[in-house]
């Protein structure tokens, strides 16, 4: 194969010796198994599993029990090979590098049968000097070692003491010792995902040749001068200089929209050199800042930086630069022990509302630009402003962060360490240091990233005794923890990026953890930092179940995906809640029973004699249960923003677990694999609305709060309505006098004893009626219509099966569903099967005879296709 040379950034007339070339090695490769019995083509970027699937040697890895049947793939040692010709004499170049942006994971790299380097970290860039090895005709081999075997070998060599955990719980069908390999930790199995320890070249690979120097990293960070009230821009460019002579030239920075044109003289000496440029923006120039979604615009400015160096060598970089500040505020709170824990963006306190992001697929080459756009657009469509990139996955691809910049999604960025203790031997630490240095350089220019976090739950795992470690080794583990996350990761982060905070773990007690030597005896202290909270036994409709914490960065409940999603990876014999498939797909111990337990607290379990009908009804009820549970919990956190009760409160963040799915299985997600919205995601669109009325009971008293995430005070009125389950006619209604909710506050709007409320509504009891309420001004709805159940729905009286029909019409690219119902219907679920798209609302309480809902397709469809696929379910249909 003849590869063309891409001449980079060289002006016309420049001598060939000054040019830089980049030769892409993406595309067609060959792979073979350890014994050579399997030989096949493969695509780079990619992995072995994808290559086998594309050649139909294996079926869909997600189908039924294939995660077990295909375990042999990860246990084998695979080799990638590429033969290519170069039409240029590489000997004319001073330096030639073979660069891998990502290798998964443990491999020996050979060029023309000469070993040129080893890899052991999925998360770092590798650059190998091949100046004296490259020829006109070349063969690259990447000989991978099984990650499963490697992890076991590294664990066996660590004989001084145990580094737990050894293996995941048996229910996860996973592999052991993932903490000994710098690889996507969930690829060895997790409680929501399969074990697929991949091998492959998962990112870009190329050859770079140059004579003078090469630009390796280009970074920039806006800095606000509080004293001068001006913006500055720091631009850092990392060069590899191979010339023995001093290289001189100019760096020209241009930001036309800010009237910036600045020229700097620069000099580069031999070796790894970083050029720092400082751009001071005139105080008279108005700079529009970047704001999170819902709080303002995501204004960015086009910037170009041109390096014109000796001999006509020219490098040009273009980027969008955003201006914003971020501050993590930990300060005393009146009438409360402890400290606050919240983020200020551009000086404004922001309540983080969102979810947690996990890898969108076990096979990263299947995560397309379209899929990222769909998932992240669904984030802002649900009124979220933040995601936590969880530490057991991957540092996401560049496009992920670019989309978050564009959409205004704040990112809490974990480093990739999760639910484990880790070794601190020299080889491991050397690899981690390279990883962290690379990722900070790669990511720090993104305004969307507002904080770094050292790990997921590892402080809690150590200090709360998750792994039954021997007491005599506690100090050893503490020393290792501080060595890894504080002395190394934290040090590297703070040296490379002074523009955003770093916390050592999540959950953590923040400043208190630091004061206690980086590990707190109780990392879940509600008076400090962030917490993670899960409780599948207590009644999730009871708000007293939940912690009145400063910031809740994980919480949630499981549900099953829709039947249309499961159908693609299952067969008819699997369509039962007690089937082998249903048990196999559930990776949380007792998870399926815990869902039934929560359902039984407030709903009737399906009892149809038709097995498929009962299965579908159960799937539906798990989504109803999950949505209602997370709604109750999130609303509790939102109304806790402005209050302190018994020293607890001032909650400033709610990130539920989890946003997306890695495969088709029961999980905590609100988006199914492929992006279909669960009922929870529709609920999130309401409970994360900028203005929300929240209702709850305490000692027979109904309270309604108003929670505002607006930037300005708002005058409005509250309307409270009562319906019976047996009639579509409104029983009674009352409205308050106009009042003002202050910007960014949560305040009590309404209190009334429930017996008094019902007394004024003829024929109403707790079991026969339901309360709804909303905020409005001058007849205009300002909030979602919220509701409060006065009893468990399994005890509801007068609830009938509703005959709900839909008339579908098309308006441009949108479809209109005009609904009619014969009865009050809770949890009305509209479904169009596998047709990709989302509704404007779903899972709603229908108390009116008619309602109009819109469907936004993600791919072209038709009215007839929607009519054929349409199905509607409400709660009474499951009885």
From Swiss-Prot:
Record: glycosylation sites: 35, 77, 297, 302, 607, 803
Protein's organism: Bos taurus
InterPro entries (UniProt xref): Beta-gal/glucu_dom_sf, Beta-mannosidase-like_N2, Beta-mannosidase_GH2, Beta-mannosidase_Ig, Galactose-bd-like_sf, Glyco_hydro_2_cat, Glycoside_hydrolase_SF, Ig-like_fold
The protein's assembly and partners: Monomer.
Enzyme Commission number(s) from the entry: 3.2.1.25
Disorder this protein is connected to according to its UniProt record: Defects in MANBA cause beta-mannosidosis, a severe disorder that affects peripheral and central nervous system myelin resulting in tremor, nystagmus, ataxia and early death. The primary storage products associated with the enzyme deficiency are the trisaccharide Man-beta-1-4-GlcNAc-beta-1-4-GlcNAc and the disaccharide Man-beta-1-4-GlcNAc.
Single GO biological process annotation from the record: carbohydrate metabolic process
Pathway: Glycan metabolism; N-glycan degradation
Protein's name according to its UniProt entry: Beta-mannosidase
UniProt tissue specificity: Detected in kidney (at protein level). Highest expression is found in thyroid tissue. The amount of transcript is significantly higher in normal tissues than in tissues affected by the disease.
The organism's place on the tree of life at top rank: Eukaryota
Catalytic activity: Hydrolysis of terminal, non-reducing beta-D-mannose residues in beta-D-mannosides
GO molecular function: beta-mannosidase activity
Main location per the UniProt record: other
Keywords recorded for this protein, A-Z: Disulfide bond, Glycoprotein, Glycosidase, Hydrolase, Lysosome, Signal
GO CC terms in record: lysosome
Homology family: Belongs to the glycosyl hydrolase 2 family.
Disulfide-bond pairs as recorded: 167-176, 540-629, 732-761, 764-769
PTM annotation: The N-terminus is blocked. N-glycosylated.
């Amino acid at each position: 194969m003849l590869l063309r040379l891409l001449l980079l950034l060289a002006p016309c007339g420049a001598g060939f010796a000054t040019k830089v070339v980049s030769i892409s090695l993406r595309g067609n490769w060959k792979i073979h198994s350890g014994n050579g019995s399997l030989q096949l083509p493969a695509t780079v970027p990619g992995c072995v599993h994808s290559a086998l699937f594309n050649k139909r040697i294996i079926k869909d890895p997600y189908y039924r029990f294939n995660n077990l049947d295909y375990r042999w793939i990860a246990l084998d040692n695979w080799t990638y090979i590429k033969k290519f010709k170069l039409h240029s004499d590489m000997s004319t170049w001073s330096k030639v590098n073979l660069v891998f942006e990502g290798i998964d994971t443990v491999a020996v790299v050979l060029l023309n049968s000469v070993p040129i380097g080893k890899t052991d970290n999925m998360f770092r860039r590798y650059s190998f000097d091949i100046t004296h090895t490259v020829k006109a005709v070349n063969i690259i081999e990447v000989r991978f070692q099984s990650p499963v075997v490697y992890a076991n070998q590294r664990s066996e060599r660590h004989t001084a003491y145990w580094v737990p955990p050894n293996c995941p719980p048996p229910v996860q069908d996973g592999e052991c010792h993932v903490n000994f390999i710098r690889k996507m930790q969930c690829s060895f199995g997790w409680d929501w995902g399969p074990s697929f320890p991949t091998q492959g070249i998962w990112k870009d690979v190329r050859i770079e040749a140059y004579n003078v120097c090469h630009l390796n990293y280009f970074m920039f960070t806006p800095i606000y001068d509080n004293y001068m009230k001006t913006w500055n821009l720091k631009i850092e460019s990392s060069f590899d200089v191979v010339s023995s002579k001093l290289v001189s030239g100019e760096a020209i920075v241009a930001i036309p929209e800010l009237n910036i044109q600045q020229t700097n003289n620069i000099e580069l000496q031999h070796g790894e050199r970083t050029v720092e440029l400082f751009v001071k923006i005139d105080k008279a120039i108005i700079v529009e800042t970047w704001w999170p979604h819902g709080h303002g615009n995501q204004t960015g400015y086009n910037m170009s930086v041109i390096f014109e160096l000796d001999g006509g060598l020219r490098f040009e970089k273009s980027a969008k630069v955003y201006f914003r500040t971020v501050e993590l505020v930990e300060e005393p709170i009146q009438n409360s022990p402890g400290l606050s824990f919240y983020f200020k963006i551009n000086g404004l306190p922001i309540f983080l509302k969102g979810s947690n992001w996990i890898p969108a697929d076990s096979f990263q080459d299947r995560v397309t630009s379209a899929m990222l756009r769909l998932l992240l657009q669904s984030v802002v469509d649900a009124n979220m402003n933040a995601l936590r990139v969880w530490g057991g996955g991957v540092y996401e691809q560049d496009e992920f962060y670019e989309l978050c910049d564009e959409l205004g999604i704040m990112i809490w960025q974990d480093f990739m360490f999760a639910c484990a203790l880790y070794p601190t031997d020299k080889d491991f630490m050397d690899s981690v240091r390279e990883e962290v240095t690379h990722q900070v350089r790669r990511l720090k220019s993104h305004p969307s990233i507002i904080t770094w976090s050292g790990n997921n739950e590892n402080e809690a795992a150590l200090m709360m005794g998750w792994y039954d470690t021997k007491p005599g080794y506690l100090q050893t583990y503490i020393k290792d923890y501080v060595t890894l996350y504080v002395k190394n990761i934290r040090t590297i982060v703070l040296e490379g990026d002074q523009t955003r905070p770093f916390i050592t773990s999540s959950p953590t007690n923040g400043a208190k953890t630091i004061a206690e030597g980086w590990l707190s005896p109780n990392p879940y202290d509600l008076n400090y930092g962030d917490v993670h909270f899960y409780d599948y036994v207590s009644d999730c409709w009871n708000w007293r179940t939940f912690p009145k914490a400063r910031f809740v960065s994980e919480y949630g409940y499981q549900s099953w995906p829709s039947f249309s999603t499961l159908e693609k990876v299952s067969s008819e014999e699997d369509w039962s809640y007690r089937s082998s498939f249903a048990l196999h797909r559930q990776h949380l111990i007792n998870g399926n029973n815990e869902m039934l337990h929560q359902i039984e607290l407030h709903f009737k379990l399906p009892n149809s004699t038709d097995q498929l009908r009962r299965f579908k009804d159960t799937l539906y009820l798990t989504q109803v249960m999950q949505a209602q549970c997370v709604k109750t919990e999130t609303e509790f956190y939102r109304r806790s923003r402005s209050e302190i009760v018994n020293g607890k409160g001032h909650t400033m963040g709610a990130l539920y677990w989890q946003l997306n799915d890695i495969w088709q299985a029961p999980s905590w997600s609100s988006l199914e694999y492929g992006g279909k919205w669960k009922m929870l995601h529709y609920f999130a669109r309401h409970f994360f609305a900028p203005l929300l009325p929240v209702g709850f009971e305490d000692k027979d008293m109904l309270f309604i709060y108003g929670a505002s995430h607006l930037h300005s005070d708002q005058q409005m009125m509250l309307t409270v309505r009562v319906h019976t389950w047996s009639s579509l006619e409104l029983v009674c209604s009352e409205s308050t006098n106009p009042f003002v909710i202050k910007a960014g506050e949560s305040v009590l709007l309404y209190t009334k004893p429930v017996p008094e409320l019902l007394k004024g509504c003829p024929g109403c009891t707790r079991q026969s009626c339901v309360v709804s309420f909303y905020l409005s001004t001058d007849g205009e709805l300002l909030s979602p219509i919220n509701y409060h159940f006065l009893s468990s729905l399994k005890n509801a009286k007068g609830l009938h099966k509703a005959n709900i029909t839909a008339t579908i019409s098309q308006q441009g690219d949108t479809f209109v569903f005009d609904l009619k119902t014969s009865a009050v219907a809770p949890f009305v679920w509209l479904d169009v099967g596998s047709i990709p798209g989302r509704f404007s609302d779903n899972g709603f309480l229908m108390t009116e005879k008619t309602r109009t809902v819109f469907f936004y397709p993600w791919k072209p469809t038709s009215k007839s296709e929607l009519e054929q696929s349409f199905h509607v379910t409400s709660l009474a249909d499951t009885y």
